[in-house]
From Swiss-Prot:
InterPro entries: bHLH_dom, HLH_DNA-bd_sf, Mesogenin/MesP. SMART domains: HLH. It comes from Danio rerio (Zebrafish). Pfam families: HLH. Residues 27-45 have a biased composition (Low complexity). Coexpression of ntl and spt is required for expression. Residues 22-79 are annotated as: Disordered. This is Mesogenin-1. The gene is msgn1. Gene3D superfamilies: Helix-loop-helix DNA-binding domain.
Length: 131
């Protein structure tokens, strides 16, 4: 293994090392850095043919920062509220559309609601222009 390959591998191993734990174990598992092969440390399948190809890409990416449980819960709640608000707005749009736009009592999909609303507004605009 060339010196640069060892340096890249060492940097990769150290970036995954869990420095917060007392026993200084590697990552979340009980495996040691020695059990991690060079090929598996590189994310690209090209790593086997060119040892530095996969690691160069991995070196450029920043490691994912774990979101705290509280932040995830807040983000999830915000997303739920956003989706509820969107569903409410679409429901209101459906109420303004004439019954002829709905299919046999089935609710329109989101995209159908938007397309039919655009079509209906164009029709109303055309009527107003004629007057």
């Amino acid at each position: 293994m060339a010196q640069i390959d060892v340096d890249v591998f060492t940097a990769k191993v150290l970036s995954h090392w869990d420095w917060s734990r007392e026993d200084r174990s590697f990552g979340d598992s009980a495996s040691s850095p020695e059990s991690e092969s060079f090929d598996s440390a590189c994310s690209s399948p090209d790593a086997r043919s060119s040892p530095t190809a996969g690691c160069e890409h991995a070196e450029q990416q920043k490691p994912k920062v774990k979101m705290s449980m509280r932040r995830r819960m807040k983000a999830s709640e915000r997303e739920k509220l956003r989706m509820r608000s969107l569903a409410e707005a679409l429901h209101q749009l459906r109420d303004y559309l004439p019954p002829g736009y709905s299919r046999r009592g089935q609710p329109l999909t989101k995209i159908q609601t938007l397309k039919y609303t655009i079509q209906y507004i164009k029709e109303l605009s055309g009527i107003l222009e004629q007057q």
